[in-house]
Every structure is written in structure tokens, then in C-alpha cells.
Regions:
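Terminal targeting signals and extreme-terminal segments of soluble enzymes
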Residues: 1-130
Length: 130
């Protein structure tokens, strides 16, 4: 179980729904926490959601006692705007290697329309021995 208290996940209202080695799913509200000044979902909130599901997805492939993973690169194409409701992100691994992983993330609105597509590269590092 991952602790999310006092994290960006808590601040943005991101909730993890499912996660396995094959896919990771989370939802995020479109509300005062995630909108930009014109009332639409902020692109940065979408990117934060995308990196969240990629990071948690990558975590499924490592030994957390021996390794850690961090976002190395992320890109996003914002396809459609959203004013309210909830968006859902699904991350699937495209590459799972020893030192890097690449995830494809699609974010959809409540009508299942694609609103953002993203690709995130994760770095895998060894934890220092204590």
C-alpha cells in the first residue's frame, strides 16, 4: 500500500483504481484543484496524472528494497478539453528494461473520449546499501 497523504496525489485528488504489471489505472477529478483560470482541466494536471500512473506502474516491475524508479522524460499531447467530471488514466508498459522503462498513458473523459495521450520514460536505479 502506497502512502499518499501530503503528496501531489492527495492535493490533486488522484485515486489509484488498479495496478498490475500489465496496466495501471487512476482517476482524477476536474475541479478547482485541477482547472486552469479559464475553467478547463490544466494540462499540467494531466501530465501529473500521467506520470503518476507510469511511476506506480514501473514500481510493479522492481524490487523496492533494492531499486527505485523516477520519471526521466514525459511528453503529452492534449487532444480535447474537459470542464468537469472525472478523467481516467491508463498506463501500459511499452518497454521494461533493467535501467529504463517506457509507458504509454491515455487519459479519457467520462464519455471515454481521448483527452490526452502521453509517453513517460522511467529511470530505474539501485538503492544505496545501508
Amino acid at each position: 500500500v502506497m502512502e499518499t497523504k501530503h503528496t501531489l496525489l492527495e492535493a490533486l485528488g488522484i485515486e489509484l483504481k488498479e495496478c498490475s504489471k500489465e496496466r495501471c489505472v487512476a482517476v482524477m477529478p476536474v475541479d478547482e484543484r485541477t482547472r486552469q483560470p479559464f475553467g478547463y482541466l490544466h494540462g499540467g494536471a494531466s501530465v501529473a496524472l500521467a506520470e503518476t500512473v507510469a511511476s506506480i506502474g514501473a514500481y510493479q516491475h522492481i524490487d523496492p528494497k533494492e531499486q527505485a524508479c523516477f520519471g526521466l522524460e514525459i511528453n503529452a499531447n492534449h487532444i480535447k478539453s474537459v470542464k468537469d467530471g472525472t478523467v481516467k488514466a491508463v498506463a501500459t508498459p511499452l518497454h521494461v528494461g533493467k535501467s529504463t522503462m517506457v509507458f504509454q498513458i491515455d487519459i479519457r473523459d467520462e464519455q471515454d473520449s481521448l483527452i490526452c495521450t502521453s509517453r513517460c520514460t522511467m529511470a530505474v536505479i539501485s538503492r544505496p546499501s545501508s
